[in-house]
């Protein structure tokens, strides 16, 4: 009989108690024999008919979710014991695919034959079969657990009176034959971009059929590219009636009732410092040097108290959670919160009283965090500045200094603290990247008119440092109270990534210190060492590729990139849901310290689910914006076909190499088939192509002259050729 303390407690509470999924899985994994339902009933002391029915329902749900398998002899077993895995299908335009699982680090290979049984995006149950001749572990489709039910965007076509749609996403490498349409087919001309809903259980074994549910347009432009991205990545972009109704009850101005239990900081000259085109201001800062013989600085970081307006489980909260993050496209913002909240009520606009959550910090003369405290307050921003304005004032711009002469003393205080943080910055202990970013100048149609380099000045870095300090203080606070919260985790690179990165460095005459497990400081030292090399950006890019992606999770695993033992996101609750969650937890803990009623406390299960979802929405936003930017780049490069440009090899693959064009910071492909002077093979360790006869090489960092051959807008591809072979 399997009984734990949880079961004893739950049996007292519920008459028809049944075991948790975790208990069932533990028993199935540890028991060597196949287990029938009768045996499970005996193991868990289940006697009543109600309990047996409830257990049967739970087992069926676990089977449906791929957690267990029901065998022919009417017994249950875990997938692991049968070398069976659950995963998501990732299609490829050439017909084959991969299975992405949580069990394996590398994706499992799905052959063209196996891909006929499923489509991109399906969640399937698969059997792991032996490695193929290329050494890849492959999978055999057993069952589709959750078919991909997303809407697919594609181009409408007609051939021999047959109507079909060719998906924009090449991972769906099939035609969708149109059965019917919610919109009259007569109104849809050939070449129009439409949205299709697939018929249930669609596979390539038979014709894939679907229904047109929306017409997006025909003439490609930035706005249509955004529409496609929103639907391709299933991003919510409309507000429900419930949200609109809730917004009606939120007042734009705060009153004395809202000030209750808040510290009045309206007299302090807080500033917001952001980009020129920023519309939502969720953070403001103020600092001053300590007096009365004390050494160091006081820094106030005021963050908009979004959690005051967005209560848990309301329509606004559910909509914000679903979106997870704001998405910034060139001509459109898809905000996490409606504009009444994001750019009005919660935005720290100049000369407007706003509710805030404060992180007040005491810093040493070296900018180190000594003590901190969080509290609710009301502030009034004394000015909205841009990074460039602050930087110019710090450097003595006469016109701006005169314009802001009343605030000049406080701006110079920021400058003094900035110099300290720049010298002793906490982020310098971690891996500090100096990326060259492209700045796209758009015309009236939101198409690229020109491209320049976006230079980050000291004002950018100062605000970033202040936000990092506030995030560190917030992480320490929640960690101290051991409350379930979302940490921002960045795991150290895995062993294979370190080995591969070191192989590249070796070819370049460089090395990474730190032995088998290098620390962040070892990477930081490497970046300092190569900072003057012409191939600095290229090496930095390879380093970035070797790193893992940061994620949100209640398990505090630290932030490798910043070299921190714990880290949370606290400073952007208007545009990031994890920050809103952190605010709620902090406010709950502040009330707890005062023995007041609790605000809102999450349990571990809730936080885990929210973390997984927010990590996904962050990746989704990145992919959607990348899609639109790639389209804009291709649209711009169409005008450059035939031009000869200089660039640097930014990546080398088995099918060619990518060249980053110096003038535009855009990558294009020189396909291996265009290298006709020799037969080239790929050196995966040295990341280079080598000529078999000539021994000519094309390596990362090589400078070349290339000609723009063609641009494929649909596939977002720019093809180049060598202008002059070596």
Swiss-Prot record:
Keywords assigned: Cytoplasm, Exonuclease, Hydrolase, Nuclease, RNA-binding
Gene Ontology CC annotations of this record: cytosol
Compartments where found: Cytoplasm
PROSITE patterns recorded: RIBONUCLEASE_II, S1
Chain ranges of the RNB domain: 262-590
EC number: 3.1.13.1
Substrates-to-products reaction catalysed: Exonucleolytic cleavage in the 3'- to 5'-direction to yield nucleoside 5'-phosphates
Matches recorded under Pfam families: CSD2, HTH_12, OB_RNB, RNB, S1
Domain S1 motif: start-end pairs: 642-723
Listed Gene3D superfamilies: Nucleic acid-binding proteins
NCBIfam families tied to this protein: 3_prime_RNase, PRK11642.1, RNase_R
Function in brief: 3'-5' exoribonuclease that releases 5'-nucleoside monophosphates and is involved in maturation of structured RNAs.
Family note: Belongs to the RNR ribonuclease family. RNase R subfamily.
The protein's name in its UniProt record: Ribonuclease R
Record organism: Buchnera aphidicola subsp. Schizaphis graminum (strain Sg)
């Amino acid at each position: 009989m399997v009984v734990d303390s949880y079961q004893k407690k739950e049996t007292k509470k519920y008459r028809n108690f049944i075991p948790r999924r975790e208990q069932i899985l533990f028993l199935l994994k540890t028991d060597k024999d196949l287990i029938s339902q009768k045996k499970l009933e005996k193991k868990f002391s289940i006697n009543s008919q109600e309990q047996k029915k409830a257990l049967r329902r739970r087992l069926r749900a676990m089977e449906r979710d791929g957690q267990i398998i029901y065998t022919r002899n009417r017994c249950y077993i875990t997938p692991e014991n049968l070398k069976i895995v659950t995963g998501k299908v990732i299609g490829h335009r050439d017909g084959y695919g991969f299975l992405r699982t949580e069990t394996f680090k590398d994706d499992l290979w799905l052959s063209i034959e196996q891909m006929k049984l499923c489509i991109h995006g399906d969640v399937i149950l698969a059997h792991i079969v032996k490695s193929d001749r290329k050494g890849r572990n492959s999978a055999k489709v057993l069952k589709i657990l959750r078919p991909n039910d997303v809407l697919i965007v594609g181009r409408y076509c007609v051939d021999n009176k047959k109507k079909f749609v060719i998906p924009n996403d090449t991972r769906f490498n099939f035609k969708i034959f149109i059965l019917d349409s919610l919109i009259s087919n007569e109104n849809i001309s050939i070449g129009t971009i439409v949205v299709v809903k697939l018929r249930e259980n669609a596979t390539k074994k038979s014709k894939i059929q679907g229904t047109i549910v929306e017409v997006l347009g025909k003439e490609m432009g930035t706005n249509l590219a955004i529409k496609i991205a929103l639907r391709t990545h299933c991003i919510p972009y409309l507000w429900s009636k419930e949200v609109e109704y809730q917004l009606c009850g939120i007042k734009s101005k705060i009153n004395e009732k809202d000030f209750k239990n808040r510290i009045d900081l309206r007299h302090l000259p807080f500033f917001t410092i952001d980009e020129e085109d920023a519309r939502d201001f969720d953070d403001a800062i103020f600092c001053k040097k300590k007096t009365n013989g004390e050494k160091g600085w006081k820094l106030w970081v005021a963050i908009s108290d979004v959690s005051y307006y967005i209560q848990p489980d309301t329509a606004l909260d559910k909509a914000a959670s679903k979106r997870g993050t704001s998405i910034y496209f060139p001509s459109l913002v898809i905000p996490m919160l409606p504009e009444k909240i994001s750019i009005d009520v919660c935005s720290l606009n100049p000369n407007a009283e706003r509710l805030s959550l404060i992180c007040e910090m005491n810093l040493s003369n070296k900018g180190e965090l000594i003590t901190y405290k969080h509290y609710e307050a009301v502030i009034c921003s004394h000015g909205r500045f841009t990074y460039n304005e602050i930087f110019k004032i710090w450097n003595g711009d006469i016109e701006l200094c005169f314009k802001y002469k009343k605030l000049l003393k406080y701006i110079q205080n920021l400058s003094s603290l900035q110099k300290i943080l720049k010298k002793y910055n906490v982020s310098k202990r971690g891996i500090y990247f100096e990326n060259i970013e492209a700045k796209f100048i758009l015309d009236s149609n939101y198409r690229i008119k020109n491209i320049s380099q976006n230079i980050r000045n000291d004002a950018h870095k100062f605000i970033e440092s202040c936000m990092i300090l506030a995030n560190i203080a917030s992480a320490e606070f929640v960690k101290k109270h051991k409350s379930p919260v979302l940490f921002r985790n960045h795991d150290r690179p895995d062993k294979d990534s370190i080995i591969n990165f070191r192989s590249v460095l070796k070819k370049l005459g460089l090395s990474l210190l730190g032995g088998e497990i290098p620390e962040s400081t070892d990477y930081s030292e490497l970046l300092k060492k190569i900072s003057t090399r012409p191939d600095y950006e290229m090496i930095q890019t390879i380093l970035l590729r070797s790193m893992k992606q940061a994620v949100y999770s209640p398990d505090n695993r630290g932030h490798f990139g910043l070299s921190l033992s714990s880290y949370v996101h606290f400073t952007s609750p208007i545009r990031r849901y994890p920050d809103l969650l952190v605010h709620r937890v902090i406010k709950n803990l502040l009330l707890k310290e005062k023995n007041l009623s609790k605000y809102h406390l999450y349990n571990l299960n809730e936080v885990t689910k929210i973390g997984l979802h927010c990590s996904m929405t962050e990746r989704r936003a990145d992919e959607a914006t990348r899609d639109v930017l790639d389209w804009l780049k291709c649209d711009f490069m169409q005008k450059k076909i035939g031009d000869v440009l200089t660039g640097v090899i930014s990546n080398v693959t088995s099918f060619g190499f990518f060249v980053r064009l110096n003038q535009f910071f855009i990558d294009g492909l020189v396909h291996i088939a265009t290298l006709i002077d020799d037969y080239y093979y790929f050196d995966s360790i040295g990341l280079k192509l080598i000529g078999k006869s000539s021994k000519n090489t094309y390596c990362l960092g090589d400078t070349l002259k290339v000609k723009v051959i063609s641009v494929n807008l649909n596939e977002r591809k720019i093809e180049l050729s060598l202008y002059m072979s070596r």
